[in-house]
């Protein structure tokens, strides 16, 4: 049951949030390209993006929730 729920969550995230993941990818790349200290390996980045997308999706893509998730992934982003 838990595995099925996880697969359903993953599918809805992938369907709904592919563009959001691209945006997060781009923002993180911009923030970390000149700062090796803040670079995350690809697997960590993907896990964080998936969590952020699930969180945003569950909150109906609310603008403030999106900003909060982006700041969580890349706290260097200026408002």
From Swiss-Prot:
It comes from the Viruses. Its main location: host cell. One of its GO terms (cellular component) is host cell mitochondrion. The keyword Calcium does not apply. It is found in: Host cytoplasm; Host mitochondrion. InterPro entries: Rotavirus_NSP6 (IPR006950). Keywords: Host cytoplasm, Host mitochondrion. Interacts with NSP2 and NSP5. This is Non-structural protein 6. It comes from Rotavirus A (strain RVA/Rabbit/United States/ALA/XXXX/G3P11[14]).
């Amino acid at each position: 049951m838990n595995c099925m729920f996880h697969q359903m969550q993953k599918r809805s995230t992938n369907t709904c949030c592919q563009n959001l993941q691209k945006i997060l990818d781009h923002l993180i790349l911009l923030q970390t390209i000149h700062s090796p200290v803040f670079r995350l390996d690809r697997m960590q980045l993907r896990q964080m993006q998936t969590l952020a997308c699930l969180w945003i999706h569950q909150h109906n893509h609310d603008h403030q929730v999106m900003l909060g998730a982006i700041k969580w992934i890349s706290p260097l982003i200026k408002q």
